[in-house]
């Protein structure tokens, strides 16, 4: 896969550019848009700018521990994504800020007969910023077609931990892989240069997604992307040992870890269900949190 490297917008010292521009005159409004700019104030990270429109909202942040890190929960009151829908999510964390962002529930994609449902996610991290982006699973139902583009512009000193779990939704005949397509593209940019590019494409009607080289008899897929200057070979080996132990406990799991060209790692896991994969990715996250910040395992409270 090849892609042109975008140029990061200019920003003042210790600050990050704000969320992406509004649609121009005559451009169709997105189905839902949410923009957050987060910055440290008085030892805690707070939202210094917040905007939402259409079918995206964010709940008042709560604190999961005493670290001062806020947890923001993104909500879609519409309940699901339909063909032709377009969502935009912009999150910027300024220098030394820290935040955890999740969703209130799974992202449910329904029939998309004419056009795919799309979501554009733009994450911006300033120097020393920390963002844990841990949404609930993506569920693609029968005839669903979903395209997601995630672009991360981050300072080399920042920390990103981002997860994704893809789940085949229920179909009337009880079979799996009845969705039309799931395409997830993630690009990480540092100093105007693309340093990580991951392009995941699942099209059951065109590819034998259940076969060798794809899901290999499993139905669910999980990924965890970590970009942080503290990642080294020893940490990658620790993660590998954690994954190997998980495979011994749960024989239906298949998982691995790879080191990135920049300090970072990516975990890919196949399994029989979203719960097993979510727990596995949170186990890896807990290892990183314990080593880097002394925080405990993420225990999300959702209402």
What does each of the following model-derived ranges do?
Residues 2-5, 15, 26-33, 37-53, ...:
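N-terminal intrinsically disordered, cationic/polar leader segments
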Residues 57-60, 110-115, 143-145, 171-175, ...:
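A short, polar/proline- and glycine-enriched secondary-structure boundary/capping micro-motif
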Residues 93-95, 103-105, 125-127, 135-137, ...:
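Short, structured patches in soluble enzyme cores that scaffold and shape functional sites
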Residues 166-303:
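A structural signal for small-residue-enriched, beta-sheet-centric alpha/beta enzyme cores
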Residues 98-100, 130-132, 159-161, 222-223, ...:
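Structural motif
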Residues 2-137, 142, 149:
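N-terminal, charged/glycine-rich beta-strand/loop interface patches
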Residues 31-35, 69, 86-88, 118-120, ...:
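Broad gene-expression machinery/nucleic-acid interaction feature
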